[in-house]
C-alpha cells in the first residue's frame, strides 16, 4: 500500500487536473457567451443542461460516489450559468406585487434559471432591525418601515445581476 505522502501527492496531481479542466471549461463558457451575444441566442437553454446531466449520469453508471460527483457537477453548471448571466444579463430584476401573489416563488425560479442572487426585501429589513416585519410596524410604524424599503431599493441600484423581491407595499 502507498504511503500517505504518496497518496497526498496523487491527490495534488488530481487537483491540478481539476483546476486546469475548470479553467479550460470557463474559457469555453466565455466563448459560448460571446457566441450567444453575437448571434442573439437565448441565455437559458434547458435542453442543453439536461443533455449534459444525462451525459454525466451515463458516464458515472453505478459509481459508488455518484451523488457526490453529481453535486460537484451541478455546482459547476451553476457557476457556468452564472458567468453567462453576468455577461449577457447586465441588470437587475425587480418583482413587485401584493403580498401573497408569488414574488418569492418566482424569485427562486429565476434564481435557478439565471444563477443570480436574490434579495428578499422583507427578510433583509427584518434581519437589519433584529425583529419581524410586524414588530417593526408595531414598534416604529409604517413610515419607518417604508423608509427602510426605500433605503434598500436605493442600495440595490448599486448592485448588478440580482433579483429583488420587493415587499407588498413597494
How does the language model describe each region?
Residues 1-91:
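Domain-level signature for soluble enzymes in the chorismate/prephenate branch of the shikimate pathway
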Residues 95:
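Hydrophobic anchor at the beta1->P-loop junction of P-loop NTPases
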Residues 98:
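P-loop (Walker A) phosphate-binding loop of NTP-binding proteins
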Residues 101:
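ATP-binding Walker
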Residues 104:
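Walker A/P-loop
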Residues 120-170:
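ATP-dependent small-molecule kinase phosphotransfer cores
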